[in-house]
UniProtKB/Swiss-Prot annotation:
It is a multi-pass membrane protein. Homotrimer. Its main location: membrane. This is Porin Omp2b. Belongs to the alphaproteobacteria porin family. Pfam families: Porin_2.
Length: 367
């Protein structure tokens, strides 16, 4: 009996001790669920949700290397060797939905390296040749090329002028602006109305910017003004823009038509007129009162596209360029291009040679 009581008492003591230890034990919290990156397919391929938000982000860019030879078709000068250029561009897009429409941003950073012909006439570096032209140079630079915000149809920030973007660029050509259709980068506030029937309209207030050695920014509170109308359908599109340069108090206009002949072959034609017959302005930078551009694109195969552009202005400059863009593998395109410029009329006395032939090969990896 005493042994039984002893055993029962020992068991009770052990149970009590176990309960006390359990009461003192630290209970580890349940691990929080890990929030993995989610794919966002509302705005196209490549977007994902920024963790903890409903904002979609896409990161993209390209690495490019250009090799140029022959003449400079913009100036008529002989390169006397190879010119090289490299660029790394990094782009960020964000989008989210609000009660006022889609709120978006776009930024692009460019890291550039250029190396001009560094050895000819027996000299090196920054010496000059017999024409007092620099014997060679290397330059690097970093630019915030684009940085703008969009909300519905509104856009504000650093972008390219609506004088270019609304009508469309001058073909899929590298040397596309030998005859310039206006300056590009500018600060602006713009609104684009897009109807459901293919009709759209734009109005923009622009600051202007620097282009090569010229400054076309406004000199007071009055901005440059751009307005345009467009109609687009399955057959193509027709668009027109009018721009007022507040510095020289003159205007310029462009009208462009695009036609899709087939799903692989398209053509386009653009005409322009300026009230000031000088290239030294923000918009009408061709020579004289008028200029015309035209081109075509033919998708020869799934990998190869042929592009052609021709242009002529009132002062007598003629430019023709052709290339073949070949996608070697997905994301990597090689583009050989040949350009010719005839400097006639009033351009003839501004260049060393009347005729210029130049070539370029571009290697570009896009991601």
């Amino acid at each position: 009996m005493n042994i039984k009581s002893l055993l029962l008492g020992s068991a009770a003591a052990l149970v009590a001790a176990s309960g006390a230890q359990a009461a003192d034990a630290i209970v580890a919290p349940e691990p929080e669920a890990v929030e993995y990156v989610r794919v966002c397919d509302a705005y196209g391929a490549g977007y994902f949700y920024i963790p903890g938000t409903e904002t979609c982000l896409r990161i993209s860019g390209y690495v490019r290397y250009d090799v140029k030879g022959g003449d400079d078709v913009y100036t008529g000068s002989d390169r006397k060797g190879w010119d090289k250029g490299a660029r790394f561009a990094l782009m960020f897009n964000t989008n989210s939905e609000t009660e006022l429409g889609t709120l978006g941003t776009y930024t692009q950073l460019r890291f550039n390296y250029t190396s001009n012909n560094s050895r000819h006439d027996g000299q090196y570096g920054d010496f000059s040749d017999d024409r007092d032209v620099a014997d060679g140079s290397v330059s690097t630079g970093t630019d915030l090329q684009f940085a703008y915000i969009t909300l519905g149809g509104f856009k504000v920030g650093i972008d390219e002028s609506e004088f270019h973007t609304f009508t469309g660029y001058l073909g899929d050509i590298i040397n596309d602006d030998v005859i310039s259709a206006g300056s590009y980068r500018t600060g602006k506030i713009a609104y684009t109305f897009t109807g459901g029937n293919g009709f759209s309209a734009v109005i923009a207030l622009e600051q202007g910017g620097e282009d090569v050695d010229n400054d076309y920014t406004i000199d007071g509170y009055m901005p440059h003004v751009v307005g345009g109308l467009k109609y687009a359908g399955g057959w193509g599109s027709i668009a027109g823009v009018v721009a007022y340069d507040s510095v020289i108090e003159e205007w310029a206009t462009k009208v462009r038509g695009d036609v899709n002949i087939t799903d692989r072959f398209s053509v386009w034609l653009q005409g322009a007129y300026s009230s000031a017959a000088t290239p030294n302005q923000n918009y009408g930078q061709w020579g004289g009162d008028w200029a015309v551009w035209g081109g075509l694109k033919y998708q020869a195969t799934q990998k190869a596209a042929f592009n052609l552009q021709a242009a002529h202005d009132d002062w007598g400059k003629t430019a023709v360029t052709a290339n073949v863009a070949y996608e070697l593998v997905p994301g990597f395109t090689v583009t050989p291009e040949v350009s010719y410029t005839k400097f006639g009329g009033e351009w003839k006395n501004t260049v060393a040679e009347d005729n210029a032939w130049g070539g370029i090969v571009r290697f570009q990896r896009s991601f």
